[in-house]
Amino acid sequence: MLSGVTLWCAIWWVTEPVPVPATSLIPLAFLPILGLLDHKATAHSYGDSLILLLMGGFMLSRAMECTGAHKKVAIAVVQGVARLGGHGGRSVILGFMIATAALSMWISNTATTLMMLPVALAVISGSNDKKFAIPLLLGIAYAANIGGIGTPIGTPPNIIFMGAFDKLGIRDEPYGFLEWMKAGVPIVVLFVPIAWWWLTRGLSGKETFNLPKGEPWTPGQRRVLIMFAVAAGLWI
């Protein structure tokens, strides 16, 4: 019966006869009815602390997307790095990769990539270097995946690992947020430059780029950034 419920959910997730979130509620209704799990244990799984942690990350991601705060952060980082490198192609790509990795540590990899693409495409459209587009787009994709390693909420598999690690009872204390960052952030710091060097090794770096100019921060963007900083501080 459990296999049947699992197969039912899988088929509906793929075919989407109802919204995906609605399909996710099937176990909540049918596991108790079929006697596979009591209703309290089933509901407790939906309210697990790690699920709520992931939900909080998604809410922050949505807030940044709606207000456009992510673009302000990205443009500021890219401009800062590019300024140090004379606005050459290699420095622009490094700026995009650093901004993407930094955002991806707190927002899902896919969402971060989608957020960065419009800014990157605007820069590409003003470039005459045919070799510039591919390293930039691949750099954003790679940096998003690398950045997702930095924090537990960077990507859902991190949360799944934390939950499995705690349930295995390998040690008495749970695997904490800060403890994850101590292991994950050095990996991000190491591999972003390595990926950048590999992707840009064929670029001449002679062309300079005009980056989008940052606009003043709106009150909504400031509030989202403050909430983001408070949430990150409390998580750590």
Spell out what each predicted region is.
Residues M1-L53, K167-I170, E179-I236:
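Hydrophobic transmembrane alpha-helices of multi-pass small-molecule transporters
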Residues L60, C66-A69, G86, N128-Y142, ...:
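Juxtamembrane and boundary regions of transmembrane helices in multi-pass small-molecule transporters
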Residues A10-V18, A99-S108, A141-I153, L234-I236:
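Transmembrane alpha-helix interface/packing and boundary motifs in multi-pass membrane proteins
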Residues V5-W8, L53, V92, F96, ...:
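Hydrophobic transmembrane alpha-helices of multi-pass secondary transporters
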